[in-house]
Structures are given as C-alpha cells and as structure tokens.
C-alpha cells in the first residue's frame, strides 16, 4: 500500500512548484527590500490571508539566523543555523515558542537522488508534526525535491549558495522557510526555517542537472526548528510594516 504521507516524486519532477488543488492559499514569496536581501525561499500555506503579513514578518525575522558556513565548506555561503535561530526566536514579538528543533546529518552512497529526498523528508516531517495536512506534505515534497534537483533553474537565486568545488565534489547550501496556518495549526502559525549544507560527490555541471532517477553520493546537514506564534491579524501591525512587507510582492 502506498504511504499516504508521500507525494509521488514523479508527479513533481517537471514542475516541482505545481500544486494539486487545495483549499489553502500557497504563496511563494520573494520579499524585495532595497536595504536587505532575503536569502530564505519563503513558502507560505495560509488558509486565511489576513495572516499573510505575519508569515512575511516571521520570514524576515529568521533571515537573521543565516550564518556563514565553515571556511572549509565555502568562503561566503550562508546557512540557516538552528542555534542562531533559537536566539532569534527569543527576540520575536509578539512572543512565541520553539516547540522542536533539529541539527542532523544524513548521507548515502551511490544511490538514487529520490532516496536522499525521502531521507530528508522523514527528518522534516518529524519537525512539522501536527501541521502535516496533505497539502503541506505536497509543498514539503516539492521544496525538498527542488533542493536536490532542478538546480540549473535556481543557480543564481538568493537562497542557494555555491561553496567549494573540486573535480569530485560540489558543495552548496540551500535555505527555505515554511509558514503554515491551517485547520491543523489552530490558533497559532507554525514557522519552520530549514538550512541545508550539502556535499555531493559530483562536479557542479552534473549537480545542476540531476534528476530524481540519477544516482549520487551525499552528505547533508539539516538544521531546522519549528516556531509557534499566536495568530496576528494584519490590522495589528503598524501600517509601515504592511507597506514595506508587501510592496511589489503581492
């Protein structure tokens, strides 16, 4: 019997951001602020758009939790840091709570890319927990698939950083954030920033065009947390926050 918690990878290979029908509004945002580059790809599943500004504000807050990787990995790559994220969470207003966090390594040797995707999905599903409605699972599967495939179309995006390269290995980081408000989350919004530090035993030219059927060896560090904040209506934010957050993005 097919596992209901898995969206078939084959369904999203061609267009990983295409979403099946859902009652929730799924919005991928690029927040354009002339004074700040946002290096988190924000994927917001919001049933009530009155809380969309809250999702944007949380994404901006956790941008501060991206830190440089080790010099051995790269000179100027940024990755979401779970430790720094815990510090940032304590400064967010109105206050919320970190209900789960993870700093975990997963690896594989010469196996299909789809196998690595499923390993990472298992880690992130344990973080998301109660928020895992079917639509959220589909978005999560799409995002993780896009972390390891379709990289040629993302290679210059702000959420991906290319690290050191050799004739046998390519390093990169990938940062994504989920903000979820639906029937499962109740009176809170869940914010789940995720940072990946990825080492692939392949040259960059091959990494850029990997598909889920290809085989590769990986070492991946995953850092993430789940932050729960009581729902905040857009009307409760100052008008300046509203203007700066959504100008040119919605």
From Swiss-Prot:
Modification after translation, per record: Active after proteolytic processing.
Keywords for the protein's UniProt record, in alphabetical order: Sporulation, Toxin, Virulence
Pfam families, per the entry: Bac_thur_toxin
Gene Ontology terms, MF aspect: toxin activity
SUPFAM superfamilies documented for this protein: CytB endotoxin-like
Amino-acid biosynthesis keyword on record: no
Gene3D superfamilies tied to this protein: Delta-endotoxin CytB-like (3.40.198.10)
An annotated GO BP: sporulation resulting in formation of a cellular spore
InterPro entries, per the entry: CytB_endotoxin-like_sf (IPR035918), Endotoxin_CytB (IPR001615)
GO CC terms: extracellular region
Known function: Kills the larvae of dipteran insects by making pores in the epithelial cell membrane of the insect midgut.
Protein family per UniProt: Belongs to the cyt1/cyt2 endotoxin family.
Protein name listed in UniProt: Type-1Ab cytolytic delta-endotoxin
Origin organism lineage: Bacteria, Bacillati, Bacillota, Bacilli, Bacillales
């Amino acid at each position: 019997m097919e596992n209901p918690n898995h969206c078939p990878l084959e369904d999203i290979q061609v267009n990983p951001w295409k979403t099946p029908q859902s009652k929730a509004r799924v919005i991928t945002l690029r927040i354009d602020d002339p004074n700040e580059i946002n290096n988190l790809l924000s994927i917001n599943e919001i049933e009530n758009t009155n809380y969309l500004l809250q999702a944007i504000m949380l994404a901006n807050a956790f941008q501060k939790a991206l830190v440089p990787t080790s010099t051995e990995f790269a000179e100027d790559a940024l990755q979401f840091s779970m430790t720094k994220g815990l510090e940032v969470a304590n400064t967010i207003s109105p206050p919320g709570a970190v209900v789960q966090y993870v700093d975990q390594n997963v690896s594989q040797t010469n196996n299909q890319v789809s196998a690595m995707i499923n390993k990472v999905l298992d880690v992130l599903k344990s973080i998301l927990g109660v928020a895992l409605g079917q639509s959220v699972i589909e978005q999560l599967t799409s995002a993780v698939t896009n972390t390891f495939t379709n990289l040629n179309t993302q290679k210059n995006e702000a959420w991906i950083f290319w690290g050191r390269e050799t004739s046998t290995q390519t390093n990169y980081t990938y940062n994504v954030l989920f903000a979820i408000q639906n029937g499962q989350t109740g009176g809170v919004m869940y914010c789940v920033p995720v940072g990946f530090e990825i080492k692939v035993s392949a040259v960059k030219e091959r990494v850029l065009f990997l598909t889920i059927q290809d085989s590769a060896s990986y070492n991946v560090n995953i850092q993430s947390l789940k932050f729960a904040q009581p729902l905040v209506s857009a009307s409760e934010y100052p008008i300046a926050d509203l203007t700066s957050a959504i100008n040119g993005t919605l």
